[in-house]
Amino acid sequence: MTDGALTRLEHGLAALKADHLARRRPLLDGAQGAHVTIDGRRVVSFCSNDYLGLANDPALVAAAHAALDGCGVGAGAAHLISGHHRLHLEFETDFAQWVGKPAALLFSTGYLANLAVVTALISRRGEVFADKLNHASLVDAAKLSGARFSRYRHGDLAQLESRLAASTARDRMIVSDLVFSMDGDVAPVDALLDLAERYDAWLYLDDAHGFGVLNGGRGGLSERARASTRVIYLATLGKAAGVAGASVAADGRVIEWLIQTARPYIYTTAAPPLLAAALRESLRQIAAGAARRGRLQRHVARLRSGLGGLKNAVLADSFTPIQPLIVGANADALTLSQALLQRGILVPAIRTPTVPANTARLRITLSAAHSDADVARLVETVHELA
């Protein structure tokens, strides 16, 4: 490594710091939850994606322990060698049934799943049409596919249709977050499906933040989308599900094609079987989780009522557990986040380039594990500081 290369890194790091864009990894001790120990201090956390409070649920912990005793720690091989365990298959079967699709495939992460699906189904002769606010993994997947990459303005279906109509690609795929992670708004699934049918395109929906929460826990698909063979559905499993990984659900022929051709699936060691055991229990808890979801929605309503009318910040329009409080400048968002932390409330600032310039925000996320008092404390403290 040359001194010049390292010097360029030093200059780049200094520039990130000067622009209030340098990031750090807060250090968690103990289990995830509404109240956590971060960097040695006890705080109320409003920044995890553990929407149903399942990450430390005793039933999931017990399921993982039982599988650990019976299966050990690691899978030991890729799925197509000797790492595909009975527990993986049982979870895939249960997941497909729960979300209303014929078949499913388990991946180690959502990022990996997105790379696998897009690159396996779209070639260099294809075209990917993506909402401008999609998750970074969908952007990277489209770029790695080698296909033409067309991004349309957030939620602008007219622009999407004009680009579909102009496309001469052999294969087309519309890709979209289902719940957008930085704004909390929800994609118009049936309208996207209309366009996919009209222009003979796949519709790939990343439901990282809707699965377990929307539609009784089954996620953001409409009944029509569940029945469509052109709709491919992704749920990540480290958020509302409380564990780790991701699962893709689709027509059985799509899933078999991914097994045979998706390089991120083929050339990756399988996830530990104990995670699949915990995920099966998570599905049971999600299915029986009406009370958790009801409590979560009450928290959303209380927060939105309590933080309406702030002078120097505004809540984005969202009915999901993602409640972005838009502040504006990076420095202002950091200042508010740090002031809340001094009061024992953890809500990190989200800055450029994750969100557009001048829309830095506190990304408040709510959980069924929060108490009414936790939410009231957040509302009161934001009013004092914002």
Swiss-Prot record:
GO terms for biological process: biotin biosynthetic process. It catalyses: 6-carboxyhexanoyl-[ACP] + L-alanine + H(+) = (8S)-8-amino-7-oxononanoate + holo-[ACP] + CO2. The modification N6-(pyridoxal phosphate)lysine is found at K239. Keywords: Biotin biosynthesis, Pyridoxal phosphate, Transferase. It is an enzyme of class 2 (transferase). Its cofactor is pyridoxal 5'-phosphate. The keyword Transferase applies. It comes from the Bacteria. Pathway: Cofactor biosynthesis; biotin biosynthesis. The keyword DNA-binding does not apply. Pyridoxal 5'-phosphate binds at G110, Y111, S181, H209, T236. Pfam families: Aminotran_1_2 (PF00155). Its EC number is 2.3.1.47. GO terms for molecular function: 8-amino-7-oxononanoate synthase activity; pyridoxal phosphate binding. Catalyzes the decarboxylative condensation of pimeloyl-[acyl-carrier protein] and L-alanine to produce 8-amino-7-oxononanoate (AON), [acyl-carrier protein], and carbon dioxide. PANTHER family: 8-AMINO-7-OXONONANOATE SYNTHASE (PTHR13693:SF100), CLASS II AMINOTRANSFERASE/8-AMINO-7-OXONONANOATE SYNTHASE (PTHR13693). HAMAP family: BioF_aminotrans_2 (MF_01693). Homodimer. NCBIfam families: bioF. Belongs to the class-II pyridoxal-phosphate-dependent aminotransferase family. BioF subfamily. This is 8-amino-7-oxononanoate synthase. It comes from Thiobacillus denitrificans (strain ATCC 25259 / T1). The gene is bioF.
